[in-house]
Amino acid sequence: MLCLLFLLLGLTGLQTDDNSERLRVQFTVPEKIRSTSSGGVETHVSYIILIEGKTYTVNLMQKAFLPHNFRVYGYSGTGSMKPLEHEFQNFCYYQGYIEGYPNSMAIISTCTGLRGLLQFENVSYGIEPLEPSIGFEHMVYQIKPRDSSSSVYTEREIELREKPYKIQNVEPLPDFSQYIEMHIVVEKDLYNHMGADTTVVIQKIFQLTGLTNAIFTSLNITVILSSLELWIDENKIPVTGDANELLHRFVKWKRSYLVLRPHDMAFLLVYREKSNYIGATFQGRMCDKHYGGGVALHSSTISLESLAVIIAQLLSLSMGIPYDDINKCHCPGDVCIMNPAAVHSSGVKLFSNCSVEDFLRFISKPKSQCLQNQPRLDPTYKSAVCGNGKVEEGEQCDCGNKKACDALPDTCCVADTCRFQPGSACDTGLCCESCAFIPKGHICRGSTDECDLHEYCNGSSAACQEDVYVQDGHPCGQNQWLCISGICVDGIKQCFDIFGEGTSYAPAECFQRLNSMNDLSGNCGVTPTGFTPCTSENVRCGKLLCTYDKREVISVENASVMYSNINGKICIGLHYEYGNEDEGMMWVKDGTVCGESKICQNKQCVDSSFLNYDCNPEKCNNQGVCNNKKHCHCNPSYLPPNCEHSAPGWEGGSIDSGNFPPSEPPTGGPAFTDVGTTPLAESRYIENVYRSKPTRWPFFLFIPFFIILCVLIATLVKVYFQRKKWRTEDYTSDEQLESESEPKD
């Protein structure tokens, strides 16, 4: 126990060393209960977290604050500035609230476990992963800031008042967004105080930015960390003197050295063991390139939560938002942001009606236009850096530094330019060998399951084709089960994988009897307070139950094996304690068949129609299956797209496989042209080749008949007019003869 306590004291969290008093440390295993994703990134997520014996539901929404060109800067041994190469994630920062507590706030990072702050109206809890831990264990602790007398700001000195605000609702803001781009400099002493580890310090500055962001949510402001600078070995300016002197010294330095790094505000964060001042800025000068700066003094008596309040107050002052006169201003909570006491209080802090009015006044003026610049906040935000070993935008290749490149067996890439060597087509990839593309038809990703499909090199790309698999809902496992995401969700295999030989999927009576008991033997879920019962229609989707026909006792690590005799059959199941990382093994897997046209989904037996399985065997001429793109994957010797034509010796596949049919197929088959530079382009081309074309031969057959008919009509017309002319001439001649034969008087 003593070792564990020392370990906990060394963990990095929302506070540094003795910044704040931790009350009783609690341990919890957060449970994810909801998640919504977009583009492979969770945009909304909810967790159940146990705090002081009570469960709370925390709802979170992604809150990005790093721009696409974000960089961390340091200095080389010669004193020249250089970018520091570190892995950053811009998609694992969230902001939200605790369900049922309208005046709550949650600021959480999920990059490595849950790390952040849970703020109720007047109390804050820190949460961070327990390291090392086998499971998803976290520790939760209440943060109680220590009292301190350092609360005076140089540019706007305000008397610290102990009188309470008059509480009144604040009018809502108009629905528009503003953005503050912030450059932060961490001086040497603070870098050491935060752990003297670049990764740890960066993580804490990210947390600080997230906390500051949460404060400005009510004003529809997003605080962007545009860039970060670490003074690791030495400070670039003296950091002695009071905050006012340091502020003028810093803005003078920033005018010369931060010209090329865009920002609305630049902050110097300085560590002081004790200080009468905790910050300084120029009031109302945020968008001024000469005076848009501030200094925050981080003393040993404040937490990261308190430092976020200091940053928020400095940003507010720089927008012309003064401290509150608590005799005139109204606060929607106990303490508002622009009260010096906010630095030493826990819980959610909002802006008073005076602050809102001052903010609206500031953004109505032309000098606030810098806040309307919306940075690009892509999750993939890093600019390309040649030599870091990762191929980024604008690079053909990147083998690392010159030494690493020279050590490779095939030198396909020029280390200095990140371009291919002359004559090289590739340097890495499943379909690249000796700097050249592997010929078409080579299997680059073999199938791993009867519901998975081979992918092949296409001969024109270093990348293997996109992973494709049999369409969800296709029967498998001797037509007893269904394919889901390239895996046959086979109940028999689930039992074998856990219990080994001698086991099989339990019959219906085992599920009906045991999973309706709502105890260790069978249930539809485990919570911190007990079991979730199975309804009669969901009994086959709760605890996984298997039959066992051997006499040996089964042992499963960290689990209890439950035995039951049901109508002469031994039915067995597992039980893990709540929060165990392997507890998913004791449930029937999603996608397992639970009835006619029904499958298990989230421990419920639901209609399988949501899989949208629509592959009729006749679509592929009974010679193939549909893949997840709903294209036919043909059996060997049959050609896509519809498996209608044959080509003896061809291994089979689809228009998505990469092994497109040969350029000269057997007689009777359609002709193919081998064109394409990438897997996607080639797929489009082949699909167009196979697309049916309108029949045109009747048109060409009709043309000769049409010409003959036209000639015939022209001839008849000519004959008609010729004969008419002859008749007219004959009539005229007859009249002349008749007149000549008449007697004269």
Swiss-Prot record:
Residues 17-174 form a propeptide. One of its GO terms (biological process) is male gonad development. GO terms for molecular function: metalloendopeptidase activity. The chain crosses the membrane at residues 697-717. It is found in: Membrane. GO terms for cellular component: plasma membrane. Keywords: Cell adhesion, Disulfide bond, EGF-like domain, Glycoprotein, Membrane, Phosphoprotein, Signal, Transmembrane, Transmembrane helix. The signal and the metalloprotease domain are cleaved during the epididymal maturation of the spermatozoa. Expressed specifically in testis. Residues 178-375 form the Peptidase M12B domain. Residues 383-472 form the Disintegrin domain. Residues 611-644 form the EGF-like domain. It comes from the Eukaryota. Its main location: membrane. SMART domains: ACR, DISIN. Residues 17-696 are extracellular. Residues 718-745 are cytoplasmic. It holds the Pfam family ADAM_CR. It is a single-pass type I membrane protein. Glycans are attached at residues 122, 220, 353, 458, 558. The modification Phosphoserine is found at residue 739. Heterodimer with ADAM1/fertilin subunit alpha. Sperm surface membrane protein that may be involved in sperm-egg plasma membrane adhesion and fusion during fertilization. Could have a direct role in sperm-zona binding or migration of sperm from the uterus into the oviduct. Interactions with egg membrane could be mediated via binding between its disintegrin-like domain to one or more integrins receptors on the egg. This is a non catalytic metalloprotease-like protein. A tripeptide motif (TDE) within disintegrin-like domain could be involved in the binding to egg integrin receptor and thus could mediate sperm/egg binding. PANTHER family: ADAM A DISINTEGRIN AND METALLOPROTEASE DOMAIN, DISINTEGRIN AND METALLOPROTEINASE DOMAIN-CONTAINING PROTEIN 2. This is Disintegrin and metalloproteinase domain-containing protein 2. It comes from Bos taurus (Bovine). The gene is ADAM2.
